[in-house]
């Protein structure tokens, strides 16, 4: 077919007056998810049709969503230096994964099935500050440094994102 590492079939469903394409993406590194989606959109447009959504059956790796988000941000001339959660949400919207029903990345992305958020990571900043000021030896300097470093990196990313695509920067 037109795309490598992709198996697809399409048909028309009379009762819904819509066409449907079923795709098995064998290797997203050979043919990225967004390339498959864009190709289906192109083929539909040739027939005077429009893609109205997509659906994922089962689980998927995180990387194809991140790649798709970066692709769509590039098309918009925007910086891809945004938080992972924002990239995932952009990919979900851009690929229409939330059009036919809810798409919960916590349930659909393989890596999110195995992530455990420890007590410090899931703690609100004000609670973290209170915990640092307590008599307990942990969290200590390392955790405080990690928070300060991550805030500095976030601020640098914000400045970069504010200047991307603007003349004079």
Where are these regions (language model features)?
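Long, contiguous binding/interaction regions
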Residues: 1-127, 134-135
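Ribosome-associated translation termination/rescue signal centered on the conserved GGQ peptidyl-tRNA hydrolysis loop
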Residues: 19, 156, 161-164
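A sequence-level detector of short, solvent-exposed, charge-rich linear segments
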Residues: 59, 73, 144-151, 163
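Conserved phosphate/anionic-ligand binding catalytic regions in large, soluble enzymes, centered on
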Residues: 132-159
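A structural-propensity feature for long, helix-poor, extended segments
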Residues: 165-169
């Amino acid at each position: 077919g037109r795309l490598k590492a992709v198996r697809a079939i399409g048909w028309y469903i009379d009762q819904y007056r819509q066409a449907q394409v079923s795709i098995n993406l064998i290797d997203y590194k050979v043919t990225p998810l967004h390339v498959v989606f864009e190709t289906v959109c192109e083929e539909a447009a040739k027939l005077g049709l429009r893609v109205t959504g997509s659906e994922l059956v089962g689980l998927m790796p995180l990387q194809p969503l991140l790649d798709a988000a970066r692709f769509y941000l590039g098309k918009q001339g925007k910086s891809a230096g945004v938080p992972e959660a924002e990239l995932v949400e952009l990919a979900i919207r851009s690929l229409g994964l939330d059009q036919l029903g809810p798409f919960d990345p916590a349930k659909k992305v393989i890596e999110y099935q195995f992530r455990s958020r420890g007590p410090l990571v899931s703690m609100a900043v004000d609670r973290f500050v209170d915990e640092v000021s307590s008599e307990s030896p942990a969290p200590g300097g390392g955790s405080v440094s990690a928070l300060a470093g991550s805030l500095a990196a976030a601020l640098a990313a914000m400045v970069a994102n504010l200047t991307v695509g603007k003349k004079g920067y």
